[in-house]
Curated annotation (Swiss-Prot):
Binding-site list for GTP: Q11, E69, S138, G142, T143, G144, N204, N226
Major place of residence: cytoplasm
SUPFAM superfamilies cross-referenced by the UniProt entry: Tubulin C-terminal domain-like, Tubulin nucleotide-binding domain-like
Modified residues (Methylhistidine): H137
Protein name, per record: Tubulin beta-2 chain
Source lineage: Eukaryota, Fungi, Dikarya, Ascomycota, Pezizomycotina
GO biological process: conidium formation; microtubule cytoskeleton organization; microtubule-based process; mitotic cell cycle; sporulation resulting in formation of a cellular spore
Subunit structure: Dimer of alpha and beta chains. A typical microtubule is a hollow water-filled tube with an outer diameter of 25 nm and an inner diameter of 15 nM. Alpha-beta heterodimers associate head-to-tail to form protofilaments running lengthwise along the microtubule wall with the beta-tubulin subunit facing the microtubule plus end conferring a structural polarity. Microtubules usually have 13 protofilaments but different protofilament numbers can be found in some organisms and specialized cells.
UniProt-annotated binding residues for Mg(2+): E69
Cell cycle in keyword set: no
Organism: Emericella nidulans (strain FGSC A4 / ATCC 38163 / CBS 112.46 / NRRL 194 / M139)
UniProt superkingdom: Eukaryota
Length: 449
């Protein structure tokens, strides 16, 4: 079976990750300690994508939990799902990265990384046919961003032909934890562009908006935000975990979603999002789901896709949905919003179906889009980065850990290149595409010579 090894690093990564495990262990009929209590064979059929069977009907998540300080781990271990994880898979330091990317990537994190790789190797060896890795982390802090990206590049070295998906929480415009977020995020994006195959961009700001506007929560907690993220994560992987008519795995998703290797930063959305109070007043239908899924306010990435164009997008419907109805709806959507799709990639919307709905819903849909408007997100970070870097503010925290200013300059220019690549494809048309393509091929040949 196509197994996935899950790594969660840093405080944010661990909290998002534990919400994810809570969601999918519920979907597979496991109780809080991993004992199977479900009633459907479908739940067991592909349990081993994410779980190892321990014996005695107990299933253990194939998760590696990593942090540079013990606090988050202790909280997880004593939390409601603490008994779910394998105790050897908690790996933590005692020092904390202190929101410093350099500590996570070069000093503190580097000391711990071999230990982590050993555990990852052990998890990978217990798989029949490892499909890839997924990492949950934030890009604003020190551990998730610095050590998270270090792990990604180490795993890349060791497993070069496996997929690497990351769920990355971007620093948001309004909610800032630390003043050095722009540095940490830029340095991380610099790594993700090179080493990740698919990065699902999440954003606290967008998540807050959804909680307040759509779910009508007056003061959302991180628990509420993580619940939204776990719904998307569960939706993206559902076709691996349950049988369906159209299955997609991480690799198929990447093949369909990534037209150019560097442009693998996706916007995600989920439907139905209804407040608990109003959910009983509406029936969920396929048109309703599609409508809500393409609503820019329901995107979990703080970038408005209407300012850019979709290179590709993928939708996953779950529940008792008629294939034909979904295809008709998707066709309508593409016609209605045709100006938001690039016309030089025909059939750029891919649909997958799965017969198993999430807990408590009759049907649901997950949206993943590769939109050029994701550059807004990078642009925001880049502007803050430039403002601080021009004055060399806070740089001594990084150089003190052995980093060089050159690295910052490289990361900055890589991010600017990424933005201009997105912009280039946003403006490309069918006719001028040919010329541009030849030019690029020509460059490639010259470099090879």
């Amino acid at each position: 079976m196509r197994e996935i090894v899950h790594l969660q690093t840093g405080q944010c990564g661990n909290q998002v990750g534990s919400a994810f495990w809570q969601t999918i262990s519920g979907e597979h009929g496991l109780d809080a300690s991993g004992i199977y209590t479900g009633d459907s064979d479908l739940q067991l059929e592909r349990m081993n994508v994410y779980f190892n069977e321990a014996g005695g009907n107990k299933y253990v998540p194939r998760a590696v939990l990593i942090d540079l300080e013990p606090g988050t781990m202790d909280a997880l271990r004593s939390g409601p799902n603490g008994a779910l994880y394998r105790p050897d898979n908690f790996i933590y330091g005692q020092s904390s990265a202190g929101n410093n990317w350099a500590k996570g990537h070069y000093t503190e994190g580097a000391e711990l990384v071999d230990q982590v790789i050993d555990v990852v190797r052990r998890e990978a060896e217990s798989c029949d046919c490892l499909q890839g890795f997924q990492v949950t982390h934030s890009l604003g802090g020190g551990t998730g961003s610095g050590m998270g990206t270090l792990l990604i590049s180490k795993i890349r070295e060791e497993f070069p032909d496996r997929m690497m998906a990351t769920f990355s929480v971007m620093p948001s415009p309004k909610v800032s934890d630390t003043v050095v977020e722009p540095y940490n995020a830029t340095l991380s994006v610099h790594q993700l562009v090179e080493h990740s195959d698919e990065t699902f961009c999440l954003d606290n700001d967008a998540l807050y908006d959804i909680c307040i506007r759509t779910l009508k929560l007056s003061s959302p907690s991180y628990g509420d935000l993580n619940h939204l993220v776990s719904a998307v994560m569960s939706g993206i992987t559902v076709s691996l975990r349950f049988p369906g008519q159209l299955n997609s795995d991480l690799r198929k998703l990447a093949v369909n979603m990534v037209p150019f290797p560097r442009l693998h930063f996706f916007m995600v959305g989920f439907a139905p999002l209804t407040s608990r109070s109003s959910s009983s007043f509406r029936t969920i239908s396929v048109p309703e789901l599609t409508q809500q899924m393409f609503d820019s306010r329901n995107m979990m990435t703080a970038a408005n896709y209407q300012n850019g164009r979709f290179l590709t997008c993928s939708t996953l419907f779950r529940g008792k949905v008629a294939m034909k109805e979904v295809e008709d709806q998707m066709r309508n959507m593409q016609n209605k919003y045709s100006s938001y799709f690039v016309e030089w990639i025909p059939n750029n919307v891919q649909t997958a179906l799965c017969s198993m709905p999430p807990k408590g819903l009759k049907m649901a849909a997950t949206f993943v889009g590769n939109s050029t408007s994701v550059q807004e997100l990078f642009n925001r970070v880049s502007n803050q980065f430039t403002a601080m870097f021009r004055r060399k503010a806070f740089l001594h925290w990084y150089t003190g850990e052995g980093m060089d200013e050159m690295e910052f300059t490289e990361a900055e220019s890589n991010m600017n290149d990424l933005m201009s690549e997105y912009q280039q494809y946003q403006e490309a048309t069918v006719s001028d595409g040919e010329g541009a393509y030849d030019a690029e091929e020509g460059e490639a040949y010259e470099q090879e010579e």
